[in-house]
Amino acid sequence: MAGTSPASGVRAGAVFCSAATWWVLAARKGAALVFCPILPQSENHHRADIPVPWAEALRSGCPDGARIRCRPVLRPSTQGLIRRGQFSAALTERLLTTLCAELRHRQQEDAPAPRFSTRSPG
């Protein structure tokens, strides 16, 4: 059907891969799709990382030991991505909660520092 997004039937928690990266769909924002990258095992961890349980990795087809980096990446569609599976509702809910918390942390970090007035005694 013309004008229909190729992602119209896809819901949050859907797992995709591109040539180099695995992705999980977190939400829709207007006409755009919000994805979070799924990273392979490494020593570098971030506060916004969620480990993917082995059963979820097996069910969704993503690499064992992977983790979700709760960092929003906007894409206009799923074009160029291959759907691999679906995370459970529980993991998807945890993803959304962690993503919202990370966005709040970033807002606080990016906010201008409060100015304190210093008054000399006397």
Predicted regions and their residues:
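Short, functionally important structural connectors and interaction interfaces within domains
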Residues: 2, 30, 42-44, 60, ...
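C-terminal terminal-subdomain/extension
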Residues: 56-122
